[in-house]
């Protein structure tokens, strides 16, 4: 089975937290069981019929990209990730959809993203009322952590103005300068990128 054959799980009618947890876990387990452990999925713009070097490990935990309903449904249908920063970056978080209400989550999203991208959290809580459940690829970096109820929840970014957690920007700049600049990497530039979506759901959940 390939990523293209994976049927995105539509969980938008699930309204109870317990059922959402179990359905997401089942989707994660099924995805890992049906695909190989390492999945390459980005069509290569340089080598037609092949894939570039972006991959995901299909046995890892889920992370979530929060967005408004219309964009969420289109992205799930087309297997796309939307940008939520001004220079085409996509930010995901380990914070699950049942952990906080829409307003609290919106404040967290604003702290981690700027005002730009296809999804702009500064427009209000409606911009984070739905989610796409994904697994981060090797192109994602963990750039931050929030502690909520004594639990650590990571933030992960693919592209954009993000620096890996613990990195020193000045050292990175110096290293690149000495090496003659960073090696170019093939990637898709724009507000939407082709990406495996595990599940689509609503954050309007009750206990």
From Swiss-Prot:
Pfam families, alphabetized: RolB_RolC
Bilayer-spanning residue ranges: none
UniProt keywords, alphabetically: Crown gall tumor, Plasmid
Record region (Disordered): 160-183
Amino acid composition bias (Acidic residues), ranges on this chain: 164-178
InterPro entries: Glycosidase
Keyword Zinc applies: no
Physiological role: Involved in tumor formation and increases auxin and cytokinin effects in host plants.
Protein's recorded name: Protein 6b
Organism per entry: Agrobacterium tumefaciens (strain Ach5)
């Amino acid at each position: 089975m390939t990523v293209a054959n994976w049927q995105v799980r539509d969980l938008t009618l699930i309204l109870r937290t317990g059922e959402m947890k179990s359905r997401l876990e089942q989707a994660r387990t099924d995805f890992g069981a049906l695909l190989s452990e390492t999945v390459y999925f980005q069509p290569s713009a340089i080598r037609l019929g092949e894939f570039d070097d972006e991959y995901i490990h299909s046995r890892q935990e889920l992370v979530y990209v929060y967005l408004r309903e219309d964009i969420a449904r289109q992205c799930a249908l087309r297997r796309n990730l939307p940008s939520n920063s001004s220079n085409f970056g996509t930010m995901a978080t380990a914070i699950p959809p049942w952990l906080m209400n829409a307003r609290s989550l919106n404040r967290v999203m604003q702290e981690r993203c700027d005002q730009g991208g296809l999804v702009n959290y500064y427009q209000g809580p409606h911009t984070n009322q739905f989610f796409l459940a994904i697994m981060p690829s090797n192109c994602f970096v963990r750039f931050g952590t929030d502690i909520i109820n004594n639990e650590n929840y990571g933030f992960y970014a693919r592209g954009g103005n993000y620096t890996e957690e613990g990195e020193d920007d000045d050292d990175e700049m110096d290293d690149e300068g000495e090496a003659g600049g960073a090696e170019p990497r093939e990637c898709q530039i724009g507000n939407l990128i082709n990406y495996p979506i595990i599940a689509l759901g609503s954050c309007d959940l009750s206990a």
